[in-house]
Amino acid sequence: MTEKQTWSQRFESALHPAIALFNASISFDIELIEYDLTGSQAHAQMLAHTGIISPAEGEQLVAGLEQIREEYRQGKFQPGIDAEDVHFAVERRLTEIVGDVGKKLHTARSRNDQVGTDTRLYLRDQILQIKTQLREFQRVLLDIAEKNVETLIPGYTHLQRAQPVSLAHHLLAYFQMAQRDWERLGDVYRRVNISPLGCGALAGTTFPIDRHYTAELLQFERIYENSLDGVSDRDFAIEFLCAASLIMVHLSRLSEEIILWASEEFRFVILKDSCATGSSIMPQKKNPDVPELVRGKTGRVFGHLQAMLVIMKGLPLAYNKDLQEDKEGLFDSVNTVKACLEAMTILLQEGLEFRTQRLAEAVTQDFSNATDVADYLAARGVPFREAYNIVGKVVKTSIAAGKLLKDLTLEEWQQIHPKFADDIYEAISPRQVVAARNSYGGTGFAQVSKAVSAARKEIGE
């Protein structure tokens, strides 16, 4: 890094090369260049609008910045480490293009409010992209659910067979998680969509700027009311990382279930070749790499959230260099969430097949209909807790005899309690067990069909 920095006039000696490298952020904040250019164009227009610079100078600056955008997109502008950061890289190139007029761009602006603006512009776009991905993920879940309203799957608590449910009902649980994620990102967007531009280094500026004008140009909903808060706030980034972490929680939970379902012990799903990998030594293997990677990458996003919280917890007002550390974790979290949503959507849509025959067998090979026996007695006047205790003893006796409840004879049922009649067999059949749970939000087929239709409307279909 041999060139003098913009701020170097106050210093008598050059920055140590290793420190210059340590201090530089251009290697990662180049991600913000398009947003930096857009924000700078709005700032230049405002300077001209308020008479701080001439209209002709404003036009020169805007045109020069647009030329840099084209150069960057064509691969002709690739700033090196000597630029320190994306802001200086742009300003230097702008001055090369338009001459000394380029040096007027930074009038009434600091890198502190500039980077805050860039990051918010970036995150606005990314939130909208992730929301679009969430909608596609939801559509795929609904497509599968719609075809499997009456497909049964064991439901679990404590990873022990509990009660059978509709496969569609199970998938709709993930739809609802994704819906909360979608709504949560909308809430975050509102607090991202606030302009700090014009807050200056920390105290505002002596120039007669118009912050509302730049906010309007950049389509910000409002502006920061306090300049100290505007340049030091990273709540919006933390909120996004919280929302991103919850998206990853939900994807990771689904991933864990798919990993289990694909195992020989469960055999509920088949992983198609397009979304699985093999072993370098064991030729029989088909590995669930996609859900395993999603599960693993979840920790990265959690880590970035924790890092951001730790960065912020002890910072005095206003800007501190610590805040340079907000970007890499933010960028990586955005990229991780987007990649995982894409991979999981493809996996569900193209790489997964439910083994419906195996699922049908699975729901008949356990005691997950025991609650329905208790409900059967309770519906016939036996207090539920008494019925519960009776059925608990029945299950214990059946296990000892190597029988399932469906294998008991009517005589055996009536020896247990005289209220049992021959309709007990229908009451404890898996399909009836599921169909009977027709309370709002339950797994009954009628309720699930309504839920699928309501979900379609929720996402605008």
UniProtKB/Swiss-Prot annotation:
Recorded superkingdom: Bacteria
Keywords from the UniProt entry: Amino-acid biosynthesis, Arginine biosynthesis, Cytoplasm, Lyase
UniProt main location, coarse: cytoplasm
Gene3D superfamilies tied to this protein: Fumarase/aspartase (C-terminal domain) (1.10.40.30), Fumarase/aspartase (Central domain) (1.20.200.10), Fumarase/aspartase (N-terminal domain) (1.10.275.10)
One Pfam family this sequence matches: Lyase_1
GO molecular function ontology, one term from the record: argininosuccinate lyase activity
Pathway noted in the entry: Amino-acid biosynthesis; L-arginine biosynthesis; L-arginine from L-ornithine and carbamoyl phosphate: step 3/3
Record CDD domains: Argininosuccinate_lyase (cd01359)
Control of this protein's activity: Strongly inhibited by L-arginine. Inhibitory effects are lowered at pH 7.0 compared to those at pH 8.0. At 42 degrees Celsius and pH 8.0, activity decreases to 77% and 25% in the presence of 1 mM and 10 mM arginine, respectively. The other amino and organic acids do not affect activity.
Summary of temperature dependence: Optimum temperature is 42 degrees Celsius. Shows more than 35% enzymatic activity in terms of relative activity at 25-50 degrees Celsius. Inactive above 55 degrees Celsius.
Compartments where found: Cytoplasm
Keyword Aminoacyl-tRNA synthetase belongs to the record: no
Activity-pH behavior: Optimum pH is 8.0. Shows more than 35% enzymatic activity in terms of relative activity at pH 7.0-9.5.
Keyword Nucleotidyltransferase: no
Catalytic activities: 2-(N(omega)-L-arginino)succinate = fumarate + L-arginine
InterPro entries: Arg_succ_lyase_C (IPR029419), Argininosuccinate_lyase (IPR009049), Fumarase/histidase_N (IPR024083), Fumarate_lyase_CS (IPR020557), Fumarate_lyase_fam (IPR000362), Fumarate_lyase_N (IPR022761), L-Aspartase-like (IPR008948)
EC annotation from Swiss-Prot or TrEMBL: 4.3.2.1
GO cellular component assignments: cytosol
Cited function: Catalyzes the last step of arginine biosynthesis, the conversion of argininosuccinate into L-arginine and fumarate.
Family statement drawn from the similarity comment of this UniProt entry: Belongs to the lyase 1 family. Argininosuccinate lyase subfamily.
Protein name: Argininosuccinate lyase
Gene name linked to the record: argH
